[in-house]
Design a protein with these regions (language model features):
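Single conserved hydrophobic/aromatic residue that forms the stacking wall/gate
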Residues: 1-12
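Strongly charged
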Residues: 104-135
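Ribosome large-subunit tunnel/peptidyl-transferase-proximal elements
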Residues: 13-101, 125-135
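Short glycine/serine/threonine-biased micro-segments
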Residues: 5, 49, 102, 114
């Protein structure tokens, strides 16, 4: 009796796995975790490239003087390479469908000050995600 239960339980698990894999997102993307920048500073650059085609987005981040733009440029190039190699998409039709920054853990450091005091320095991190799609 237990063997029949085990068999039916396996069928249910297989069905659940098949359903989960069918829903998987097939859009090319790239993620960077624990980037050493605050979410607010990363969003300045991400807001500028959201919805643009990839050539325009690359031009924007290349000539943007912010530190976040150099990190996002690498991430965008990685997403473009993923689209070409893994999905077989051409770069002419690609655009930035989603790009967002989520808050990561904050490293807390101490800066010594006068008369025995200490100030807390918060080194913020963020998780960056770029999702591309074809027009």
């Amino acid at each position: 009796m237990t063997s029949s239960l085990v068999g039916s339980e396996m069928c249910i698990r297989d069905r659940i796995k098949r359903e989960r894999n069918a829903v998987k997102d097939t859009r090319p993307s790239a993620k960077l975790s624990y980037a050493r920048m605050s979410v607010q500073k990363a969003c300045f650059v991400l807001d500028a490239i959201r919805g643009k085609d990839v050539e325009t987005a690359l031009a924007i981040v290349t000539y943007n003087p912010r530190y976040a733009s150099s990190v996002i440029e690498k991430l965008l190039k990685s997403a473009i390479a993923n689209a070409e190699n893994n999905n077989g998409m051409s770069t002419e039709n690609l655009y930035v469908e989603e790009c967002y920054a989520n808050k990561g853990p904050t490293m807390k450091r101490i800066r010594p000050r006068a008369q025995g005091r200490a100030y807390r320095i918060e080194k913020r991190t963020s998780h960056l995600t770029i999702v591309l799609n074809e027009r």
